[in-house]
Amino acid sequence: MVTITDCYHKANWIGHPVKVRLIIYLFAGSAPLSVFTLSTISTVISIRQLYHNGCSGFITESGRT
């Protein structure tokens, strides 16, 4: 099972323009993407965009601000 923690670690070191394609490649290359996985990837991308934009919002365990 893919967790938000697994995805975020990978997203953290990937450069901003490349990270979306690389995260999707990491999962699409090894297994079919489930709805849960797509949702997880979307949440990771949202977190990274908030971080990149300097948002000081509080991020909960669910990944929502």
Swiss-Prot record:
Segments of this protein annotated with the region Important for viral replication in intestinal cells: 13-18
Transmembrane parts of this sequence: 22-44
Keywords: Host cytoplasmic vesicle, Host membrane, Membrane, Transmembrane
Compartments (UniProt record): Host cytoplasmic vesicle membrane
Membrane topology value: Single-pass membrane protein
GO cellular component: host cell cytoplasmic vesicle membrane; membrane
Superkingdom: Viruses
Role of this protein: Facilitates virus release from intestinal cells in vitro, possibly through the host autophagic pathway.
Protein name: ORF2p protein
Organism from which the protein derives: Poliovirus type 1 (strain Mahoney)
Lineage: Viruses, Riboviria, Orthornavirae, Pisuviricota, Pisoniviricetes
